[in-house]
């Protein structure tokens, strides 16, 4: 078990998979946890956008992104860093990869999912954010080089949410329509951190 010092207390290294739909607040929550509790964020949108920006075709960038994210997360955990893997978790390989990294390294595994009771609440959020090249551009425009997989933004987001995977037990679902502060507090409590 990796231990490192935070203030005057030691705590264990943790690998957190943070999942949810585009616009659900995953990255915001990931960075808030990182700032409050000394975690490193591995953001798949940053990795995928970098790959696409360097000339990798959109259709090939997904698998390469997840492989890079898992490899980077594994390396950081091996260095004793607590990691938040910020990515929608719709693929079994990604879920199993995170579980495997934690198991192989002998560190705690945690999983947090941001869920929305009605995906229509995400549409204004998508319009309001500044998106990266790999991300859904707005409520009317999918990620560049792609189409809405199920015809419309709302239908696609609804299907994507149903496809989200999580471990069988020991995970936390947060309502993405709750306040950022409330979700941060619940996440930190789940992770065993105190937010001051």
Each PLM stretch: what is its role?
Residues 1-8:
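Pre-Walker A adenine-sensing motif
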Residues 15:
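Walker A (P-loop) ATP-phosphate-binding motif of ABC ATPase nucleotide-binding domains
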Residues 18:
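Hydrophobic anchor at the beta1->P-loop junction of P-loop NTPases
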Residues 21:
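P-loop (Walker A) phosphate-binding loop of NTP-binding proteins
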Residues 24-81:
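Conserved substrate/cofactor phosphate-moiety recognition/catalytic segment
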Residues 79, 105-110, 167-171:
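Short glycine-/polar-rich loops that comprise or flank the Walker A/P-loop
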Residues 105-127:
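Conserved phosphate-donor/acceptor-positioning beta-strand/loop module used by diverse small-molecule
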Residues 131-186, 194-196:
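Small-molecule kinase domains that catalyze NTP-dependent phosphoryl transfer to phosphate-bearing small molecules
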């Amino acid at each position: 078990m990796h231990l490192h010092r935070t203030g005057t207390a030691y705590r264990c290294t943790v690998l957190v998979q943070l999942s949810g739909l585009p616009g659900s607040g995953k990255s915001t929550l990931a960075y808030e946890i990182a700032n409050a509790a000394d975690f490193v964020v591995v953001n798949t949108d940053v990795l995928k956008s970098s790959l696409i920006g360097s000339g990798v075709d959109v259709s090939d960038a997904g698998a390469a992104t997840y492989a890079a994210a898992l490899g980077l997360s594994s390396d950081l955990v091996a260095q004793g860093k607590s990691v938040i893997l910020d990515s929608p978790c719709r693929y079994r390989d990604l879920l199993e990869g995170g579980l495997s990294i934690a198991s192989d390294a002998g560190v705690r595994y945690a999983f947090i999912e941001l869920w929305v009771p009605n995906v229509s609440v995400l549409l204004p959020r998508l319009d309001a954010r500044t998106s990266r090249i790999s991300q859904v551009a707005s409520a009317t425009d999918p990620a560049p080089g792609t189409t809405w997989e199920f015809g419309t933004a709302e239908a696609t987001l609804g299907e994507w949410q149903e496809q989200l995977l999580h471990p069988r037990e020991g995970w936390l679902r947060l309502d993405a329509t709750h306040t950022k502060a409330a979700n941060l507090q619940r996440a930190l409590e789940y992770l065993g951190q105190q937010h001051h």
